[in-house]
Amino acid sequence: MRTLLRWCLFLSLCVSCACAFMFSSMREKTKESPGKVPCGGHFRIRQNLPENAQGWLGNKWLWLFVAIMIYVMLKFRGDGENKEQHPPGLRGCQLRSPPKKAQNISPSKDFTFNTLTQLEMELVKFVSKVRNLKVSMATNSNSRQQVPESPTNLYNNVTIYEIWGEEDSE
């Protein structure tokens, strides 16, 4: 329902702006006197429009309609958000506690958190490999030696606390 309302509003706004743009060029004022105007080899009679005739953009009813449609669209959008935040069973009863925020975590936030956790783990692995490579270079061992995926020296691994500069590493 809301999608249909939004598309109707958008379509009506586009049509009204297109008509205003097309017909505004026809209303441009010319310096010719009203009355008979030469057109080809013939004379045509120009209609005398009153001085205060309004174009499409000057029509106050059109702007009122557009403002009302925008208000209605925003009102429906606000109702949809309120329904998502407060379940219908809890609306009338104020004695119950609101739903817990942990239950309302959206899948996109959960995905973002998981992605950041994976990136953090990859950063720890990368820094550990760099540190192991530095140690092997400092001890003048063979520089062509491959750094294993799971290092044998577990005490040489970097923790996330060392990366972020926190001294308390457990």
UniProtKB/Swiss-Prot annotation:
Membrane-related topology note: Single-pass type I membrane protein
Designated name of the protein: Protein FAM209
Subcellular location: Nucleus inner membrane
Cellular component annotations (GO), alphabetically ordered: nuclear inner membrane
Assembly information from the UniProt record: Interacts with DPY19L2. Interacts with CYLC1; the interaction may be relevant for proper acrosome attachment to the nuclear envelope.
Signal peptide: 1-20
InterPro entries named among the record's database cross-references: FAM209
Pfam families recorded: FAM209 (PF15206)
Region of interest (Disordered), residue spans: 83-107
Residues annotated as transmembrane: 56-76
Expression sites (tissue/organ): Predominately expressed in testis.
Biological role: Required for sperm acrosome biogenesis.
A biological process from GO: acrosome assembly
Record keywords: Differentiation, Membrane, Nucleus, Signal, Spermatogenesis, Transmembrane, Transmembrane helix
